[in-house]
Amino acid sequence: LGDVYKRQVREIRIEDLLGREEIHINLDEIGNLLEGKTVLVTGAAGSIGSEICRQLAHFPIKKLVCFDSAETPMHNLRLELEEKYKELNFVPVIGDVRSPDRVDYVFRNWHPQVVFHAAAYKHVPLMEENPCEAIRTNVFGTRVMADAAVSYGVEKFVMISTDKAVNPTNIMGCSKRLAEIYVQSLSLAIERGEVKGETRFITTRFGNVLGSNGS
C-alpha cells in the first residue's frame, strides 16, 4: 500500500498544466513557451496556487503576478519567494476574483499573457453550509477572470478544477463543474467566431492535495 501511495502522489508540474503530453516532456519547450511572458496566478497563496508560483520561478518569465484575497498567506508567500528566488520579478496583489473592477485593474496594469486560475473555495462541508459563497467565488469569479482574459488578449488561460466536478454530488463539485462549463462554452464561442478573441482555455482537474489550505 505504501508503494502504491507513493506512486500516486507527486508534485504539481507546470508542464502538466499547460496541456503537454505526459510522456516525453520537453522542459526546454515549456521554458520557451513562458520565456519573457508575464504570468498571473490567482489563488496564489493557496496550496496549489503557491506551488504553481514556485514552479514558475524556475522558468525565464518576465514577471509573476500573484493575486489572492488572503493577506497573511500572501505575506508568507512573498517572504518565501524573496528568500528563495531572488532573481524572480514578482508582484503580490491583494484582491478578489469576484470583483470585476479589481480584476480589470490587474489585467490593465500588468497585461498577463498566461493565467493560472487557482482561486476557489474547495472545502466540501463548508461549501455545503455556505452555497452562495461557493457560487459567487467558484462560478462568478471564474467568469470574471475568463472574460477579462479574453478582453485583454491572454494567450493561455489554465483553470484549476477538481475531480469532484465529475458527476458532482455536492455544492463545491457543482460550482466547479459550472465554472468548467462556462470556460468550455467561452472557448467554443471563440472557435466559432461568436466571441472575438484568441485565448486558449485549458482545464486541469486535481484530486485531494496533502496538507492543503485555502486556495
Model-derived regions: residue spans:
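Short, small-residue-biased leader/transition segments that mark boundaries at the very start
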Residues: 1-5
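N-terminal Rossmann/SDR dinucleotide-binding element
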Residues: 7-111
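SDR active-site strand-loop-helix element
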Residues: 42, 67, 115-119, 157-162, ...
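A short helix->loop->beta-strand "cap" motif at the edges of active sites that frequently abuts
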Residues: 61-62, 152-156, 198
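Substrate-positioning beta->alpha
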Residues: 141, 211-215
